[in-house]
Amino acid sequence: MKPSPQFFLAAFLSLILQTGICYGIKWIALSKTPSSLALNQTQHCKQLEGLVVSQVQLCRSNLELMQTIIQAAREVIKTCRKTFSDMRWNCSSIELAPNYLLDLERGTRESAFVYALSAAAISHTIARACTTGDLPGCSCGPIPGETPGPGYRWGGCADNLNYGLIMGSKFSDAPMKMKKSGSQANKLMHLHNSEVGRQVLKASLEMKCKCHGVSGSCSIKTCWKGLQELRDIALDLKNKYLSATKVVHRPMGTRKYLVPKDIDIRPVKETELIYLQSSPDFCMKNEKVGSHGTQDRQCNKTSNGSDSCDLMCCGRGYNPYMDKVVERCHCKYHWCCYVTCKKCERTVERYVCK
């Protein structure tokens, strides 16, 4: 029996509900903003790529923030590529912003990581910009209430995490709070993962100190609260990516909640990344599912990790090639005070997947 038009319509609507495309990370396209765009007038906000209406409005009312947010978008791309350089999915599709492939358009494990990282990055970059004096609307973070130990004193300029979280979340969460921003399940998932990113950022705030004293004795330490580098935050989020939980949107009482798919009904943990759609293995190129494949990717023959030739090449084998490396050698220290080196060339064997 031939399926009816109503069947195809229902299937189409079901697909929309499953994928639930959301615009939450399209702002990463700000990384492509030309340096020639001064961003000193409100009409410039309309020229920025990847923003929804509410983000354009935030741009107009917070022009001084936009260069910092543009820098955050660039940091997201650089950090994601570096963090996943040894994995089959190497975050290369993030550079297609705002026109992502399905690996980031659907509610996948990969999109969970990018949402978390982008939320952490924008707050991190704003908090640091306050410290360096790049933003007129904020300054150093507050001095902690607790008394430091003997030989320590509060000073320096703390990263303004509170301001970074407030302004960063206003901007990065704005698309998910629109009425037309995909299915309710996807909005809940993206907001959850963004909050996980900010939690990891908050947990990275640590005491940093500088020594003072006669002849380097370090008799007194001036300390402040500072955030870890974004690359360290990304590594924590990568571990959460590897252990992410698949969820479903299930009725519980009078409302629907995201709950783990394969576990007895329980609330989703606030500290775990979650996803709705399973990902492919990313072995073969298939743009329909956002997979670039691993053909011609470099692999490590001696590694036991994710960059090993066995895992990276998905059992297809690999080809060796010789690569010339130029490096500094025969370095000498000269009094006083400089070092001279020669340049040496050596040949190393590398491997790429078939």
Swiss-Prot record:
Transmembrane segments: none annotated. Disulfide bonds join 80-91, 130-138, 140-157, 209-223, 211-218, 283-314, 299-309, 313-353, 329-344, 331-341, 336-337. Keywords: Developmental protein, Disulfide bond, Extracellular matrix, Glycoprotein, Lipoprotein, Secreted, Signal, Wnt signaling pathway. It comes from the Eukaryota. One of its GO terms (cellular component) is extracellular space. GO terms for biological process: adrenal gland development; artery morphogenesis; atrial septum development; bicellular tight junction assembly; bone mineralization; canonical Wnt signaling pathway; cell fate commitment; cell migration. Expressed in the dermatome. The expression domain is mutually exclusive to the other Wnt genes. Residues 1-24 form the signal peptide. Palmitoleoylation is required for efficient binding to frizzled receptors. Depalmitoleoylation leads to Wnt signaling pathway inhibition. A lipid is attached at residue 215 (O-palmitoleoyl serine). InterPro entries: Wnt (IPR005817), Wnt_C (IPR043158), Wnt_CS (IPR018161). The keyword Ribonucleoprotein does not apply. Glycans are attached at residues 40, 90, 300, 304. It is found in: Secreted, Extracellular space, Extracellular matrix. CDD domains: Wnt_Wnt11 (cd19343). Pfam families: wnt (PF00110). The keyword Metal-binding does not apply. GO terms for molecular function: chemoattractant activity; cytokine activity; frizzled binding; protein kinase activator activity. Belongs to the Wnt family. Ligand for members of the frizzled family of seven transmembrane receptors. May play a role in the formation of dermal structure, both limb and feather buds. Is likely to signal over only few cell diameters. This is Protein Wnt-11. It comes from Gallus gallus (Chicken).
